[in-house]
Design a protein with these regions (language model features):
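Nucleotide-activated chemistry modules centered on ATP-dependent adenylation/adenylyltransferase
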Residues: 1-9, 14-385
Length: 385
C-alpha cells in the first residue's frame, strides 16, 4: 500500500492558516520544514473570516470556520487523504475542526494525536511536551514559566491552561498580547464613529481618518481597542464535550463593533423583533461555539437574523477610554420608530392623549389583577406584613 499524505493544521506552537494573527510566518515555515514537512502552505483567509463569520456575528450580537474549509482545499490540491490537528482531547477545537471537515469532504480521514494512546500515555500534558521540545531543541513560545496555551487570529487572542486552570488566580499581566493594560492606557479619550448598513459596519471615522472595506474597518477597530485596553474578558465557560474551562480573551475590534451595533438597534429595531432576534442570537452563538457552522440550523438562523437587519442603518458615535468604548450618540435616516417630538416631556405633539393611557393600563392589568386576587385567596398575598 502506498503511503498516505497528511495535511496538518500547523501554527508552530506547542499544541497554519493566516487568519490575521500576529505571526512570523516565515519562521513558522522554516520550523515546519526543519521538522520534516514536505511543504508549508499559508493561505490568507482574513477577508473570508470577516465577511462570513465576523460580520454575521455582529448582526447577531454574538459574544461566542474558515480555517477548516481552507485545509480541505489544500488537502485536495496536494493529494492528501488525511487531515490532522494538534487539538487536545478535552477541548472544543477538535469538534470544530472535524465536524467542518465532515461537511466539506467526508472522504478525508482524520489523524488526532492527542486521542492516540501511544501519544497521550507518553505525553500527559503540556509540561511533558515542553520537556520533550527542550530535549529535541524544538523552539516553542510556551515555557515552564509561561505555560498557558495561546491561540491567535484577527478576531481575538485566547489564553487557557497552565496557571489559568486555577480559577481564583488573576491572569499574569504579561499574558495579554492583544491589548494594553486598561489601567495604564492613554489618559486621552479617543472619539470615533461607526456607520452601519443592514447591520454591518461600512465605514469607520477616527481622528480625521475615514476607513472603508470590511477587513480594513475591522483592523482599525482592533487598533482602537488595542491602544485603549478594550475587549479583555476572563470567564469560565461550558465546553461542548461537558467540561468547564477557564478562558481569557483579547477581543478588541469585535467588542467595539458589537457594542455600537447593539446601541443602533435600540434606535431602529422594533422591540418585538428584537426580542425574537435575541433568542435566535443565542442559537447562532451556540452553533458557532460547538463547531456547527456547516449545518442547516446555523444557516436557517443566520438567514432569519439577517432579515431582521434590513433597517439597521445609521451611525453611532463612541469614545474609547481606558478599557471601555462609551456610546455618546446615535442617529439614523431610515427609521421612523423614534420621534423626538413624541418622546418629549415638554410637548403633547402626538396622535394620542395622556387620557388614553388610562385604558391601556386597565387592559394590561386584567390578568395581573386576577393573579393578585388569587394569591390573596390562597393566603399568599404579594404584600409584606
Amino acid at each position: 500500500m502506498a503511503p498516505e499524505r497528511v495535511c496538518l493544521a500547523y501554527s508552530g506552537g506547542l499544541d497554519t492558516t493566516d487568519c490575521g494573527q500576529e505571526e512570523d510566518f516565515e519562521a513558522v515555515k522554516s520550523k515546519a520544514l526543519k521538522l520534516g514537512a514536505e511543504r508549508m502552505i499559508i493561505q490568507d483567509v482574513q477577508q473570508e473570516l470577516i465577511d462570513e463569520l465576523v460580520w454575521p456575528a455582529i448582526q447577531c450580537n454574538a459574544i461566542y470556520e474558515d480555517r477548516s474549509r481552507a485545509m480541505v482545499k489544500v488537502a485536495k490540491e496536494n493529494n492528501c487523504t488525511i487531515l490532522s490537528h494538534g487539538c487536545t482531547g478535552k477541548g472544543n477545537d477538535q469538534v470544530r475542526f472535524e465536524l467542518a471537515w465532515k461537511a466539506c469532504d467526508p472522504t478525508l480521514k482524520v489523524l488526532a494525536p492527542w486521542r492516540m494512546p501511544e501519544f497521550y500515555n507518553r505525553f500527559a500534558g503540556r509540561m511533558d511536551l515542553l520537556k520533550f521540545a527542550e530535549e529535541q531543541n524544538i523552539p516553542v513560545s510556551s515555557t515552564p514559566k509561561a505555560p498557558w496555551s495561546m491561540d491567535d487570529n484577527i478576531i481575538h487572542t485566547s489564553y487557557e491552561a497552565g496557571i489559568l486552570e486555577q480559577t481564583e488566580k488573576e491572569p499574569p499581566k504579561d499574558m495579554w498580547k492583544r491589548t494594553v493594560d486598561p489601567m495604564t492606557a492613554p489618559d486621552k479619550p479617543i472619539p470615533f464613529t461607526v456607520h452601519f448598513a443592514k447591520g454591518v459596519p461600512v465605514k469607520l471615522e477616527v481622528e480625521g481618518k475615514v476607513v472603508t472595506g470590511s477587513l480594513e474597518i475591522f483592523k482599525e477597530a482592533n487598533e482602537i481597542g488595542r491602544a485603549n485596553g478594550i475587549g479583555r474578558i476572563d470567564i469560565v465557560e461550558s465546553r461542548f464535550i461537558g467540561l468547564k474551562s477557564r478562558g481569557c480573551y483579547d477581543t478588541p475590534g469585535l467588542t467595539i463593533l458589537r457594542q455600537a451595533h447593539l446601541d443602533l438597534e435600540g434606535l431602529v429595531m422594533d422591540s418585538k423583533v428584537r426580542a425574537i432576534r435575541d433568542r435566535l442570537s443565542h442559537d447562532w452563538s451556540t452553533a458557532i461555539y460547538n463547531g456547527m457552522y456547516f449545518t442547516p440550523e446555523r444557516e436557517f438562523v443566520e438567514h432569519a437574523i439577517k432579515f431582521s437587519q434590513r433597517q439597521v442603518d445609521g451611525k453611532v458615535d463612541l469614545v474609547a477610554y481606558k478599557g471601555c468604548a462609551y456610546v455618546v450618540g446615535r442617529s439614523s435616516e431610515t427609521s421612523n420608530l423614534y420621534s423626538e417630538d413624541e418622546s418629549s416631556m415638554d410637548t403633547l405633539d402626538m396622535n394620542w392623549t395622556p387620557q388614553d393611557t388610562t385604558g391601556f393600563i386597565a387592559i394590561q392589568g386584567i390578568r395581573i389583577q386576577k393573579y393578585g386576587e388569587r394569591k390573596i385567596k390562597d393566603s399568599e398575598p404579594l404584600t409584606r406584613a
